[in-house]
Amino acid sequence: MRSERPYSKISISSKAAKSLKNGHPWVYGNEILSSEGELVDGSIVDCFEGSSWQGAGFYNSGSKIAVRIISRNSNDVFDGRFWYRRILYAVKYRMTVMQGDDFKCCRIIHGEADQMPGFTCDRYGDIAVTQIACLGLEMNKDVIYKALRDVFDEIGEPLKGIYERNDLALRTKEGLELFKGWYGGADYPCITEITENGIKYSVDVENGQKTGFFLDQKYNRTAAARIAKDKNVLDCFTHTGSFGLNCAANGARHVTSVDISSQAVEMAKANAVRNNLEDRIDYVCEDVFELLTNMAAKKDHSYDYIILDPPAFTKSRDTVDSAGRGYKEINLKAMKLLPRGGYLATCSCSHFMTDELFRKMLSSAARDAAVSLRQIEARTQAPDHPILWNVPETDYLKFYIFQVV
């Protein structure tokens, strides 16, 4: 370790040190024992357990996560070259696991999984859409964005623009303002077109959910579509229509896609037209909970394949129980509506709804519906959203396909 480092020092508890040694990148405020030097929010600090250096990270006294570790190499200098190397490493990984159209439309930076805590970057062709939930990264974004552009210039796929989707509520916990817009004052259209699994989509980077599209379900859509041939499909929580479009393109007899958002339904309809699938998909703007309840009352068993892709019902441990009830309600109703031998694709995108809890919920719903679940596939997020085993927060998506028997 270099003897002279220009950073303030903090002493952390043995519990925090153990967590860092195990590879987790967070230090909580109540794990800081003492400090040496001025602690400036957004600055880099060195973390020590006694005299043993544990890593360097961004400090924020206003956040529950007081330090987000960005390096465990004491020789690192945090300049543009550092961020260039970090981003290049992430991009080369995506070039390995995502090829062709998949690389042109994927997550480039997945926060902690790419050693850039609190930073998300999704690519839609020549547009990058970013979200920052770390004060230190926000203060260094000019250097980071230049490095991002330089990396894509090097691989011969230059970026036209960077759109900042910094309207996520998590920023308020970091003391950051909410805003969205083109970085650097650029003025490009906020609607762009992508191709995924051979399906063309219009993506609204300004108003769409997340950064405009649910990239993490890329290969789950392919898996769901594989068994859709000749099926009558009910696609619930359709958003931009992706699951339904994949099913229709793969030979489904007919698809009904449902979403409570009229804006999402209109976007999904436009995507169907874009792919010449409008005659094979009906779109319904309705609350899925109410729709399933009404179908049950009418004893409507016309669908032999139901897809449930709900938004995250919980974003904290405090609401896991109520979220579990919501997940169970829609899955129980779907199981009761399906004929024996019908198919169910179901998922949860909440980290706090663990795989164990999700499986228990599904088992409980199956018991109440008096059915058995024959598992076809158990899946997770696409590899451009990598999971680090020592950072459980990076593991959040559960996706199952069953035959109901």
Please state what every model-predicted region is:
Residues 226, 240-253:
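Conserved SAM-binding loop of SAM-dependent methyltransferases across substrates and taxa
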Residues 302, 329, 343-405:
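C-terminal catalytic and target-recognition region of SAM-dependent MTase-like enzymes
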Residues 109-122, 141-213:
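Non-catalytic substrate-recognition/targeting regions of SAM-dependent transferases
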Residues 254-259:
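Conserved SAM-binding motif I beta-strand of class I
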Residues 1-125:
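Non-catalytic accessory regions of SAM-dependent methyltransferases
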Residues 304-333:
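Mobile active-site "lid"/loop adjacent to the S-adenosyl-L-methionine
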Residues 263-307:
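S-adenosyl-L-methionine
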Residues 230-239:
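Conserved class I S-adenosyl-L-methionine
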